[in-house]
Amino acid sequence: MSMNKGPTLLDGDLPEQENVLQRVLQLPVVSGTCECFQKTYNSTKEAHPLVASVCNAYEKGVQGASNLAAWSMEPVVRRLSTQFTAANELACRGLDHLEEKIPALQYPPEKIASELKGTISTRLRSARNSISVPIASTSDKVLGATLAGCELALGMAKETAEYAANTRVGRLASGGADLALGSIEKVVEYLLPPDKVESAPSSGRQKTQKAPKAKPSLLRRVSTLANTLSRHTMQTTARALKRGHSLAMWIPGVAPLSSLAQWGASAAMQVVSRRQSEVRVPWLHNLAASKDENHEDQTDTEGEETDEEEEEEESEAEENVLREVTALPTPLGFLGGVVHTVQKTLQNTISAVTWAPAAVLGTVGRILHLTPAQAVSSTKGRAMSLSDALKGVTDNVVDTVVHYVPLPRLSLMEPESEFQDIDNPPAEVERKGSGSRPASPESTARPGQPRAACAVRGLSAPSCPDLDDKTETSARPGLLAMPREKPARRVSDSFFRPSVMEPILGRTQYSQLRKKS
């Protein structure tokens, strides 16, 4: 209750006094700014419930602090009321003076922003005009003076050329050039007679050229001579290439190579034409498919048909080249065509060279990204199994050849074989007696055979299982040898035991090789 008594007393003491804070808050600029801050605060507060709870807590804290400050400052305000009144009056007078000097304080923020924008744009426009107008006028003057100087120089050059041509020396020089050019034309006509097909259009062209002007100019004659020489050179080159190609096609094996070269050139042109497109994995599949199709078509077609098609293509290319050459009536056009062709070739080469590394890297990267780890591991496992199978087949073939072919020191024949005792097993007493012996005389009589067998088996197997079995039986004399059961007959026994010969490898290793293969 004491907190609300202070303002009521102040209002009772000064009922008609204006407050500076209220006037400042009522200004459009300040009120608009406060509204903007209030909207921002409300939107932030409504963004999340946690933020709203925190803001409410701070609001309550600030309200409590302000109430406490007002309650504590109430005695001071009562004692200094006269001083506060005087300061308020002075502040109100200053605010009135500011409103008179700056009327924009009474404008809304939107109006102030529009007026400020218009003022800035007009200032910038005036500054730009002040800079660009003198530059434009100066450049126009400079260009006019330059054009006038160029026209004057051209006029002087023309007058000088006409004067030099009308002099005696000029007439002699032009006559000498005309005589030399005429002699060159006669030599060219004598050495290079025109074709029958091209004689009619060339004569018609000469008639059309001679009709408007009796004597052609020197430049036109030079251009005609250059076109004639270039056309004859290209015709001669095309004929020589055609003759060489026809002769080379008679050589056996050249036709497939030429077709393969044409396919490679077409594929390279396709790659160069697609240099701006993205590098994708299906591009490789398309190239492979087109390669297979072209290869099948080429193998199906006969040699005569390919020769006829190539001759037709070459004739069409020659006609196109001749048309391009005849379409250039002046040396400027001929040189321009040559320069254009060279420039286009250089551009294609440079673009292909710059695109090739990026294409290769992009293709490799896409293949690596598109290939999963499981596919890589499965492919690797299949490759390893295939290599093991091939190795097993190779070892089996080598062992079979060594077994059947009577090579010196390689084919080992053991009459007392493991397979020989299957039908007639020995008695138990004989087994005991044989088990008490340290070693059999046959095994000691030929000590070099196991080494040779191991040497032969080193091509396929890392160890000698038969030798290990014999050493183990000799090293254990005390064990009782039980009669072995007769194994079941299999189809492969006829392959591994053609006679009493013992196979080089053991049965376990042969079974492993069969499983691998």
UniProtKB/Swiss-Prot annotation:
GO annotations of cellular component type: cell periphery; cytosol; endoplasmic reticulum; lipid droplet
PANTHER family the record matches: PERILIPIN-1 (PTHR47138:SF1)
Oligomeric and partner information: Interacts with ABHD5. Interacts with CIDEC. Interacts with AQP7.
Stretch list, region Required for interaction with CIDEC: 291-322
InterPro entries: Perilipin, PLIN1
Database matches in Pfam families: Perilipin
Source organism per UniProt: Rattus norvegicus
Location of the protein in the cell: Endoplasmic reticulum; Lipid droplet
Modified residues annotated as Phosphoserine in this record: 81, 126, 130, 132, 137, 174, 315, 385, 387, 411, 434, 436, 440, 460, 492, 494
Biased composition regions of type Acidic residues, renumbered to the chain: 299-319
Record-given protein name: Perilipin-1
Family the entry assigns: Belongs to the perilipin family.
Record keyword Phosphoprotein present: yes
Expression (tissue specificity): Adipocytes.
PTM statement from Swiss-Prot or TrEMBL: Major cAMP-dependent protein kinase substrate in adipocytes, also dephosphorylated by PP1. When phosphorylated, may be maximally sensitive to HSL. When unphosphorylated, may play a role in the inhibition of lipolysis, by acting as a barrier in lipid droplet. The N-terminus is blocked.
